[in-house]
């Protein structure tokens, strides 16, 4: 069995993935750690404080593990995983997510790009394109780890979640775009 837990940074993937793997007695794999430990990246982006992954190498190495294991895979790149029985996309209210990421001390550009990705449903869309009806979206806003885990185990999906129906979120997106645009010369 392969379960992918995905979503933008700050939505609760790590804790939920680890708890889910324990509850189902499956191995846990953080794809980010896997990439770093196996040097499956091409460079480090100083501005975003992130590694640029080598997608082909990641897919190749991941395939070796998937073919012989039962896993919960935590990732922001669901389409790099070739197969899954369930794909859980964790979502979070953009205002709450913004505060979470700012609290981590991340650069403004990194916060803005990740919150924008959440608002636009970038990871959700990627998951749906790759895995169609195997996708379950869960809104983690103001939920405990136990509540999130119960929703996943009971396949109580909230999605698809559309943040842009809220005019406050639309205005927030415009503000995020201004932040991102201010870095255009650095990108």
From Swiss-Prot:
One of its GO terms (biological process) is ribosomal small subunit biogenesis. ATP binds at residues 10, 12-15, 104. GO terms for molecular function: adenylate kinase activity; ATP binding; ATP hydrolysis activity. Residues 30-53 are annotated as: NMP. It comes from the Archaea. It is an enzyme of class 2 (transferase). Keywords: ATP-binding, Kinase, Nucleotide-binding, Ribosome biogenesis, rRNA processing, Transferase. Pfam families: AAA_18. Its EC number is 2.7.4.3. PANTHER family: ADENYLATE KINASE ISOENZYME 6, POS9-ACTIVATING FACTOR FAP7-RELATED. Broad-specificity nucleoside monophosphate (NMP) kinase that catalyzes the reversible transfer of the terminal phosphate group between nucleoside triphosphates and monophosphates. Also has ATPase activity. Involved in the late maturation steps of the 30S ribosomal particles, specifically 16S rRNA maturation. While NMP activity is not required for ribosome maturation, ATPase activity is. Associates transiently with small ribosomal subunit protein uS11. ATP hydrolysis breaks the interaction with uS11. Belongs to the adenylate kinase family. AK6 subfamily. Interacts with uS11. Not a structural component of 40S pre-ribosomes, but transiently interacts with them by binding to uS11. This is Putative adenylate kinase. It comes from Saccharolobus solfataricus (strain ATCC 35092 / DSM 1617 / JCM 11322 / P2) (Sulfolobus solfataricus). The lineage of its organism: Archaea, Thermoproteota, Thermoprotei, Sulfolobales, Sulfolobaceae.
